[in-house]
Amino acid sequence: MKIRVATRGSKLSLIQTEELLAQIKAVEPDVQFEIVVVKTTGDLIQDKPLFQIGVKGIFEKEVNLAVLRGEADMAVHSLKDLPSELTPGLVLAGFSKRAPPHDVLISRGGYTLETLPKGAVVGTSSVRRAEFLKAVRPDVEVKPLRGNVDTRVGKVLSGQYDAAVMAAAGLQRLYGSSPPVSIVPLRVEEVPPPPGQGIVVAVVKEEDSWLIDLLKKASDKTAAIEATAERAFLAGVGAGCHVAIGGVAKLTPQGSLEFTAGYAAGGAKYVVKVFGEDPVEVGKRAAQLIAEVRQKFKQRD
């Protein structure tokens, strides 16, 4: 059996793809894979922040098209890059074991959010990260920083930026236990991560039941439950990358969910916790609370 796998061609994308394929191989040892590399709009446009490009699903549409056109059997993505609604005819069908979902502050000097010097230049092109940073440290300068993980790390190492905010998952997958920069975790209450961060997923045609069944066997159950809650939250808030909203679910050893969600704007932030058993209901409740907060912010302005 051979499965054609569409993915972006960056080093991190290929590492993430291999991670998910290893889970499939563990349940179906005889399966073979053919990698189909796809260039996306997000890969090609590097001189603008993502929210300024104005294309939804900037890292996923072209990759998923390879599946719809029959050029690949499945597409592999970082779940955080997928919009709440997939292209008709496609479904989410496989979930990797989750890497740490939180963001981190990287620097040469081992800075924390508290010890960053006044006026320090901090890089990120994420509206979410920028707004939460401004709420916590209004005295630092937030500047756009695009590029793959190596590029962003390199700009910190070269001194172009004093620090940058990035995903822990990408750094861990790329550098393992030997990163070239200091890494300080940011609590999810400080900077709530985007829904799906740390999870790698497969997207397939909804009629390919044989592949859906295989991916279900290979999926990490904890990641699938957390992803379900976070996707319900994402659908509920209905906001793209131009709004500073984050949300992350954590499955407890007792089997219940703890959901942390946040919104930031105008130098202020609001974070809420929701607890429950049903992933969809927990995600919807968190979205409802954040929607209420956004409305209050609008009324205040």
UniProtKB/Swiss-Prot annotation:
Names of the cofactor(s)? dipyrromethane
Q: Which gene encodes it?
A: hemC
Q: Where on the chain is S-(dipyrrolylmethanemethyl)cysteine found, per UniProt?
A: 241
Textual note on the cofactor:
Binds 1 dipyrromethane group covalently.
Question: What other note does the entry give for this protein?
Answer: The porphobilinogen subunits are added to the dipyrromethane group.
Q: Report the protein name in the record.
A: Probable porphobilinogen deaminase
A molecular function annotated in GO for this UniProt entry is: hydroxymethylbilane synthase activity
How is this protein annotated for GO cellular component?
cytoplasm
- Please state what class of enzyme this protein is: transferase
Query: Which reaction(s) does its UniProt entry say it catalyses?
Result: 4 porphobilinogen + H2O = hydroxymethylbilane + 4 NH4(+)
- Pfam families per the UniProt record, alphabetical: Porphobil_deam (PF01379), Porphobil_deamC (PF03900)
Biological process according to GO? protoporphyrinogen IX biosynthetic process
The organism encoding this protein is Pyrobaculum islandicum (strain DSM 4184 / JCM 9189 / GEO3)
* Membership in a protein family: Belongs to the HMBS family.
**Chain's role:** Tetrapolymerization of the monopyrrole PBG into the hydroxymethylbilane pre-uroporphyrinogen in several discrete steps.
What keywords is this UniProt entry annotated with? Porphyrin biosynthesis, Transferase
Q: Which residues form the signal peptide?
A: none
